[in-house]
Amino acid sequence: MARVKRGVIARARHKKVLKAAKGYYGARSRVYRVAFQAVIKAGQYAYRDRRQRKRQFRQLWIARINAAARQNGLSYSKFINGLKKASVEIDRKILADIAVFDKVAFAALVEKAKSAL
């Protein structure tokens, strides 16, 4: 049976991992063993945080809507309930955008929600 030399494959694999670890601190960007673990962990964090990002943005939108609604004399939960009763189907992302950039339109939405309650 012929001897299999794997130098080329190993070098390519190491190069790939070290390229992925570029910019990491200290040995994490230079030593293959440490870099491999760092890249694996980074992948785990990325996977987890892609899901967390969705939650965090929703939290941010709700906080912004709540702040704007309270300035207009209504709590967040009552505001959302009023919008649902008034059949206004605007999602939280757009509501937060309106709350930040168009105060007059948001005040009109609050009045519509108040009248539906």
Swiss-Prot record:
PROSITE patterns named among the record's database cross-references: RIBOSOMAL_L20 (PS00937)
HAMAP family per UniProt: Ribosomal_bL20
One annotated Gene Ontology cellular component of this protein: ribonucleoprotein complex
Family as reported in the entry's similarity comment: Belongs to the bacterial ribosomal protein bL20 family.
CDD domains, alphabetized: Ribosomal_L20 (cd07026)
Function: Binds directly to 23S ribosomal RNA and is necessary for the in vitro assembly process of the 50S ribosomal subunit. It is not involved in the protein synthesizing functions of that subunit.
Domain of life: Bacteria
Gene Ontology annotations of biological process type: ribosomal large subunit assembly; translation
Protein name (record): Large ribosomal subunit protein bL20
